[in-house]
């Protein structure tokens, strides 16, 4: 699979296989996989990523990070020792660095019962060798990675359940991993702007969304949930509603945020809105064609993804 310089690869897990799709200027509607990666038969994939050339994929299981080729060969395997016998409560995550030389892996070792702190590791993407490691001050269930497009840093949001979330920023240097922790335990990282200059968070209590400057984290715009009143087609004067930990940057200057609520007449409803970051204005409802609040993935280029019933992505844009 040879991709143009303007393409971007994404992956979805469909029927136990990792499917790779190219986001090109010509790829719209229901996307067909350009490559399909078959994990080892004994592996249950947790998270995954694909290389831009469509020749290799990496994935995590509960006990390993693995790299495979599109022909089914295993390139390398990095085991998480000791092996965990805990089936639930921990989901190791992975992401490729922007230059695809490093695989970043979040290990929720505390919840896995390994009797050690959580850790964040960096592996050589070619051979699986450990390049850097940092213990984290978390007892997390899972972690979301976001790769900065140009400065080499990676962001990690560690979810600790009812205890909140912690956001880290890391850079792999000659001396190992340089780690910074943002000064919050109540902000959930949602998305990073296409140019890497801003990021979006939603409060762990789901009462507000905020746009922050990158890298410092200064709040540039705050959107309390009350700012969305009155809500279209909801007649209840005091509806119970909250912001979902969903949405993202639709363009460099606009984000999509998602509300969910309940009324007496409608047990549960969901609405998406586009927010203009240049003015702070909440614009009209955004129709994302998504089945539920978390089936909406803005791509930052005025397009977004949803999922078809079989698990393949559908790419949309506004007319």
Predicted segments — roles?
Residues 1-8, 36-55, 82-98, 135-150, ...:
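Repeated scaffold domains used in trafficking and secretory/extracellular systems
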Residues 6, 13-16, 24, 53, ...:
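Short loop/turn segments that connect beta-strands within the blades of beta-propeller domains
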Residues 10, 57, 103, 153-155, ...:
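Hydrophobic beta-strand positions that form the internal "hydrophobic ladder"
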Residues 15-42, 65-87, 113-137, 161-184, ...:
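Surface-exposed loop/turn elements that mediate protein-protein interactions on large endomembrane-trafficking
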Residues 56-57, 110-114, 262-266:
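Short consensus segments that form the blades of beta-propeller domains
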Residues 59-61, 105-109, 156-159, 203, ...:
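Recurrent small/Gly-Pro-centered beta-turn motifs in extracellular repeat architectures
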Residues 67, 76-79, 91-95, 100-104:
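A generic, well-ordered mixed alpha/beta core segment in the N-terminal half of proteins
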Residues 195-202, 207-216:
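Long, positively charged binding patches that form subdomain-scale interaction surfaces
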């Amino acid at each position: 699979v040879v991709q143009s310089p303007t393409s971007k690869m994404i992956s979805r897990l469909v029927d136990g296989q990792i499917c790779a799709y190219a986001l090109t200027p010509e790829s719209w509607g229901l996307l067909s996989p350009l490559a399909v990666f078959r994990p080892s038969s004994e592996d249950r994939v947790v998270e995954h990523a694909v290389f831009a050339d469509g020749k290799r994929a990496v994935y995590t299981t509960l006990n390993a990070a693995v790299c495979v080729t599109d022909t089914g060969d295993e390139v390398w395997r990095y085991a998480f020792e000791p092996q965990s016998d805990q089936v639930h409560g921990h989901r190791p995550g992975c992401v490729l660095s922007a230059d695809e030389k490093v695989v970043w892996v979040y290990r929720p070792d505390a919840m896995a019962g390994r009797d050690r702190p959580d850790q964040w590791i960096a592996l050589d993407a070619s051979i699986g060798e450990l390049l850097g490691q940092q213990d984290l001050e978390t007892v997390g269930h899972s972690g979301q990675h976001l790769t900065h497009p140009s400065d080499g840093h990676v962001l990690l949001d560690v979810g600790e359940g009812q205890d909140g979330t912690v956001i880290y920023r890391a850079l792999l240097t000659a001396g190992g991993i340089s780690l910074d922790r943002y000064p919050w335990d109540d902000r959930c990282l949602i998305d990073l702007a296409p140019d890497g200059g801003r990021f979006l968070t939603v409060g762990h209590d789901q009462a507000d969304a905020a746009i922050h400057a990158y890298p410092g984290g200064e709040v540039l715009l705050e959107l309390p949930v009350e700012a969305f009143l009155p809500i279209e087609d909801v007649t209840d004067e005091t509806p119970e509603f909250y912001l979902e930990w969903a949405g993202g940057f639709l363009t460099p200057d606009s984000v999509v945020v998602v509300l969910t609520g309940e009324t007496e007449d409608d047990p549960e409803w969901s609405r998406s809105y586009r927010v203009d970051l240049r003015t702070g204005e909440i614009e009209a409802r955004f129709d994302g064609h998504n089945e539920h609040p978390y089936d909406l993935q803005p791509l930052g280029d005025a397009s977004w993804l949803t999922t078809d019933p079989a698990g393949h992505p559908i790419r949309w844009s506004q007319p």
